[in-house]
Amino acid sequence: MTLDNVNRAAVDRIIRVDHAGEYGANRIYAGQMAVLGRTSVGPVIQKMWDQEKDHLKKFNELMVAFRVRPTILMPFWNVVGFALGAGTALLGKEGAMACTVAVEESIAHHYNNQIRTLMEKDPEKYEELLQVIRKFRDEELEHHDIGLEHDAQLGKCDFKIGHHPKMMPGGQRMLFWQAA
């Protein structure tokens, strides 16, 4: 995939939004580790965080390769992501895992929408980006399942993140839009 043969607006938006999402996920896991890092679930969170670090590294590389600017909301993602991770971890392992399940489910759904969009445009032209998104989507779904295996359903909080934009909480809809 080269700069010359792609829909720049679509690729810019995908890379910018995914970079912001992976940055936010990294901050969530950082917050969870600050609270639960020395507990029995610490290694589980660390393993998921390590994968998120790889995702962020790849999107950093894609931003440079395709000359995409980051979202203006990076400082916001920094603070809010950490606060969300630490705040849910303060509710215990189950609260942190409930957050993980909700966030990873939402991200996987978002990646699925991007895959559909790129497949409709030209799957051969976007094969490199499609491979990255598919791989990361699959890893996000693994994190979702790990959260369920570690008692997310027993959490003291109930995260509902809708899959359809009209069902998605207004604040989250605005954040996805602003990240682009």
Regions found by a protein language model. Give the residues of each.
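Non-heme di-metal
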Residues: 1-180
